[in-house]
A protein has these predicted regions:
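Extracellular disulfide-bonded cysteine-rich modules/repeats
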Residues: 105-113
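Exposed extracellular interaction/assembly regions and N-terminal maturation sites
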Residues: 1-88, 114-128
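Short proline/glycine- and polar residue-rich coil/turn motifs
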Residues: 101-103
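A conserved acidic, glycine/proline-rich C-terminal tail/linker
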Residues: 90-99
């Protein structure tokens, strides 16, 4: 199984944690969930933007050192990714996706949509 729920108690804010061990596509019911990406390079495909998606929020955490990919942003991903090792931020503007070039356990990304765009923030140890 590619998505396995971890535990039975939702975290603060009603979030539920899942281990993701294969690539998958998010859908509107995944809003508020946390996904731990592990055991392989995982591609997470974003849902199609629409006004009904306004308020969608998801957190992706690297559970290994793979090169995970966020896809399907239709040139509508904006935000910043902090690079702890490099001491700077990578600006993301009108991107369709993002690839974690040198993954580390604990790297994380949060994506929020207003229905028109995706807004990404995150922190990596080694940058993109």
């Amino acid at each position: 199984m590619a998505l396995v729920k971890v535990g039975s108690h939702p975290s603060h804010g009603g979030q539920v944690v899942f281990n993701a061990t294969a690539s998958f596509t998010l859908d509107p019911s995944d809003s508020g969930k946390v996904f731990i990406l592990k055991d392989a390079a995982i591609t997470v495909t974003l849902p199609t933007l629409s006004t009904s998606l306004a308020g969608f929020q998801v957190k992706l955490i690297s559970g290994d050192d793979s090169e995970h990919i966020i896809a399907g942003g239709a040139s509508k991903i904006y935000g910043q990714i902090g690079d702890q090792n490099g001491g700077d931020f990578e600006r993301i503007a009108a991107a369709s996706g993002y690839t974690l070039g040198t993954g580390e356990i604990g790297d994380w990304f949060e994506l929020i949509s207003d229905g028109t765009n995706w807004y990404i923030s995150g922190l990596t140890d080694n940058g993109a």
